[in-house]
Amino acid sequence: MSVKRIAVLCVHTSPLAPLGGQKTGGMNVYVRELAKELSRRGIGVDIFTRRIDAGLPDIDTSLEEHARVIHVACGPPQYLDPIEVYPHLSQFTAGVLAFATRQGLRYDVVYSHYWLSGWVAYKLKEVWNVPIVHMFHTLGHMKHRIGAGRALLPDVRIATETQIIGWASKIIAATPAEHAQLLWLYRADRRKIVVIPPGVDLERFQPIQQLEAKQRLGIDRNLLLFVGRIEPLKAVDMIVEAIDLIRREQNELAEGLSFMVIGGNLANPTEPELSRLRQLVKTLGLDHLVEFLGAKDQALLPLYYAAATAVIVPSDYESFGMVALEAMASGTPVIASEVGGLAFLVRDQETGFLVPSRDAAALAEGIATILTEPEKRRLLGQNAVALAQQYAWPKIVDQLVAVFDDVSARCCTNRHRR
């Protein structure tokens, strides 16, 4: 049985939200690109997300012909931290049910993203009797283990995640590492888990001559690049400390650097992590080497990736690492922490370097190698492009559609048996 229409739940953040802002990043890209590829195949996709602005339309059709973004009331129409969204999930569920009733729609599958959406998916399943496919993107147990998110009541999150594993027909794990974490930390049924990584838009992210990209951006130094949310978990401070180490030991090399940070809300100077990083840069006397650019339109990212000598992803935890994949597709080596999905995605000494997390000295060594060995950098970039080809979105969606078709067919068979 081939699915015709899918309900995608992305409760706390919209695929249309600007990247690099509050709680926007890889998941937003994933949901957006997934919907576009499904739409191209003639599969209807309705993405349900909470209304964060009273001025947003009820239905946004700008994404693709067969893909719509539905804005649903869920608490006050403003940004809320995920844990603040939790008490409003019943309102969100009611809004989704009302929309489907008004439109006279029946969905073949519910594909939910993040733990908040999984809770809603179960409530919809009770009414619609359709299968749930779920992707966590990040796991509460993992964030709790590294000390992140404790203020966000992880017990509530972890309890809900455990329930979702029981409710769902299939769980999509981004990497074998996440598969193992689900088995180890949540005692998940291994028969439910399918490893399917996120994809990358190879038409958007492809090699551009580095000199051309640097000229178009007005960059005349060796560019080190970070792209992502500005939060402690992303460990941007490790890059700053690594640059300081290089300056102490190889000042001439450091003075030829430019470290650019893409992400964060520059309009909010009191943003805690951004303020902390700026103070660190000032204290170390690196103001002339470090530049905070704020969020950038994704259309510009290919130029920045291509202009970079290396893209650095020093996170304490990443379930996958979309930025690393985009950089690789652009032909730029990645220096990343050997954690989670990054350890799966980046091949050490082949497409970039893996270093221990929170190790500024190891990070500095990797940066220095990239800067001083241009032939090594060229080969790493060449290998990265080749590896990225296997993550083309059409290939990834082929695998996902096979899962959707399978769970839909099984659900249909079970209905007939009743």
Where do the model's predicted regions map?
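Short hydrophobic beta-strand element within catalytic cores of glycosyltransferases
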Residues: 333-336, 346
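Aromatic "clamp/platform" in nucleotide-sugar-dependent glycosyltransferases that forms part
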Residues: 316
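Carbohydrate-associated surface elements
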Residues: 177, 199
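Conserved acidic donor-binding segment of nucleotide-sugar-dependent glycosyltransferases
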Residues: 348-349, 353-360, 369-374
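Nucleotide-activated donor-binding/catalytic signature segment of Leloir-type glycosyltransferases, i.e.
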Residues: 271-296
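Short alpha-helical donor nucleotide-sugar binding micro-motif in glycosyltransferases
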Residues: 295-296, 303-308
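N-terminal subdomain of nucleotide-sugar transferases
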Residues: 1-69
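Conserved donor-binding/catalytic core segment of Leloir-type glycosyltransferases
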Residues: 218-234, 240-243, 260
